[in-house]
Design a protein with these regions (language model features):
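C-terminal, charged and often intrinsically disordered regions of DNA end-processing helicases
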Residues: 1-53
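Active-site-adjacent bridging/hinge elements
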Residues: 17-28, 71-76, 144-157, 202
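Active-site-proximal structural scaffolding
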Residues: 3-6, 14-15, 40-44, 64, ...
Length: 202
C-alpha cells in the first residue's frame, strides 16, 4: 500500500482513483514519446521554467530596470530547442511576450509587500495514520515570504485554473496540500508560518 503521495497525486486520487492504482500499485507507466510534440504541457513547462529561473536570479528586493528583457532572454534560451517549430515562433513566443510583460508589471508592484520569493521549492511532511505514517510531498511553483512574516503559496497556470467551487469543495487540493506543508515548515529553507494567501496566477 502506498505510503507516500505528492500534492498532484492527491488531485488524481480524488478525480480518478483507478489512475493512481494503475500507477502506484500496478506500476503502469505511459511509454516515453521519443519525438515529443509541441503541446500545451510542454508550453506550460517552458513558462514555469522561465519564471522560476528569473525568480531564482531575483529572489528579493527591487527588480532591475531591464527586468523584462532579462526574463525574455532567459525564456528565449529555453524556447530555443523548439524554435524551428512554426507554432513556437508564431503563437507561443508572442503569447509569452504578453505573459512576461504582465508578470513583470505585477512583480514590480508585489515586491513592496514581500520579503523574498522561493521558486520551484521542494517540501514534505509526515502524518501519522492508523496504518502507519504517510508522507506528503510537493514542489511548489512559488512561495513568498510576506512583509508581515506570513506566507503566500502560488501556483502558475498556463491552462485553465481550478474554479473557486472546486477548491472550496476540496476537489482540487494541490494548493491546500502545499499550504499545509508550508505552515508546518516542511519546505526547504522556509520556517513554519501562517499561510496568509493561496493564489493561482494565470
Amino acid at each position: 500500500r502506498p505510503r507516500r503521495f505528492s500534492a498532484t497525486e492527491i488531485d488524481d486520487w480524488i478525480a480518478d482513483p483507478y489512475s493512481l492504482y494503475a500507477k502506484r500499485i500496478l506500476q503502469l507507466r505511459p511509454q516515453e514519446d521519443l519525438d515529443r510534440p509541441i503541446d500545451a504541457a510542454l508550453r506550460g513547462n517552458l513558462v514555469h521554467d522561465a519564471l522560476a529561473a528569473f525568480l531564482k536570479d531575483h529572489p528579493a528586493g527591487s527588480l532591475p530596470e531591464d527586468a523584462l528583457a532579462r526574463l525574455r532572454a532567459t525564456a528565449r534560451r529555453l524556447f530555443e530547442p523548439y524554435w524551428q517549430n512554426p507554432t513556437m515562433r508564431h503563437f507561443w513566443w508572442p503569447a509569452f511576450e504578453t505573459i512576461s510583460a504582465w508578470f513583470i508589471e505585477t512583480e514590480v508592484n508585489r515586491r513592496a509587500t514581500i520579503l523574498e520569493s522561493h521558486a520551484e521549492i521542494k517540501g514534505r511532511i509526515e502524518v501519522e495514520a492508523p496504518a502507519g505514517p504517510v508522507i506528503f510531498t510537493a514542489r511548489a511553483d512559488r512561495i513568498d515570504r510576506l512583509a508581515g512574516g506570513g506566507l503566500a503559496v502560488l501556483d502558475y497556470k498556463t491552462g485553465r485554473a481550478p474554479t473557486k467551487a472546486a477548491v472550496a469543495k476540496r476537489r482540487r487540493t494541490q494548493l491546500l496540500v502545499e499550504s499545509v506543508i508550508a505552515a508546518r515548515g516542511g519546505f526547504e529553507g522556509l520556517d513554519s508560518a501562517v499561510v496568509e494567501a493561496m493564489e493561482y496566477w494565470r
